[in-house]
């Protein structure tokens, strides 16, 4: 099994931690990762676009002129699509863009991006992130000790609200629970910082 350095909160080394090869040593599949990112971004779309068709636009209930005898083209409503201010034909309607990839594909995608972090030496495992109070400065000090200056995704165990609040004002840091780790976030952030408890939770879910 592969292993990475385990760090203390102050940035000093605290031995090694073993990684499950079935999760962290998978050959990255770029096509699957791309599909997963597109799926997640599609689900983020609001899909609230809408226009008025001729049944929704106001007015136009009366025939503008008689059918015959005027010399003009016959018209039934001033809200027909060919009129200025008329209804739109086949316009966009509210819809959901969300869809799901097969479960095996989604799992391969998350394993691929996690394995890529190991290959790129962008995985940082900390034995714990414990703070007396949710202070942004305290969390920034931890990042300095870990020598993390890039965008960082911090994955915490459940219930660590103090650490989550301490990090939320840092501009290049995002905090997610272990159950909420996803392909899009891992791809978007350069460094992946895990607590040891979060690492165990991820391996329980994905193993």
From Swiss-Prot:
The subunit structure is:
Part of the 50S ribosomal subunit.
Which Pfam families does the UniProt entry name for this protein? Ribosomal_L4
- Record organism: Lacticaseibacillus casei (strain BL23)
Tell me, which GO biological process terms does this entry list?
A: translation
The Swiss-Prot or TrEMBL record describes its family as follows:
Belongs to the universal ribosomal protein uL4 family.
Record-given protein name:
Large ribosomal subunit protein uL4
Q: HAMAP family, alphabetically? A: Ribosomal_uL4_B
Chain spans, region Disordered = 49-86
What function does the entry list? One of the primary rRNA binding proteins, this protein initially binds near the 5'-end of the 23S rRNA. It is important during the early stages of 50S assembly. It makes multiple contacts with different domains of the 23S rRNA in the assembled 50S subunit and ribosome.
GO cellular component, alphabetical, reads: ribonucleoprotein complex; ribosome
Q: Which UniProt keywords apply?
A: Ribonucleoprotein, Ribosomal protein, RNA-binding, rRNA-binding
The entry lists its GO molecular-function terms as: rRNA binding; structural constituent of ribosome
């Amino acid at each position: 099994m592969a292993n990475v350095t385990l760090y203390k909160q102050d940035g000093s080394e605290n031995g090694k931690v073993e990684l499950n090869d079935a999760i962290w040593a998978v050959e990255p599949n770029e096509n699957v990762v791309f599909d997963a990112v597109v799926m997640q971004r599609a689900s983020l779309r609001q899909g609230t676009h809408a226009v008025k068709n001729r049944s929704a636009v106001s007015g136009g209930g009366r025939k503008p002129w008689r059918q015959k005898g005027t010399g003009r083209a016959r018209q039934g409503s001033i809200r027909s699509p060919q009129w200025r201010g008329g209804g739109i034909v086949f316009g966009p309607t509210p819809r959901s863009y969300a869809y799901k990839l097969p479960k095996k594909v989604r799992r391969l995608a998350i394993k691929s991006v996690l394995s890529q972090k190991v290959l790129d030496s962008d995985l940082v495992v900390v034995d714990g992130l414990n703070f007396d109070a949710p202070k942004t400065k305290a969390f920034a000090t931890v990042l300095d000790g870990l020598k993390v200056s890039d965008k960082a995704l911090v994955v915490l165990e459940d219930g660590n609200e103090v650490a989550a609040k301490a990090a939320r004002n840092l501009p290049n840091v995002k905090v997610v629970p272990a159950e909420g780790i996803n392909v899009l976030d891992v791809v978007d952030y350069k460094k992946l910082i895990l607590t040891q408890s979060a690492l165990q939770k991820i391996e329980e879910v994905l193993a």
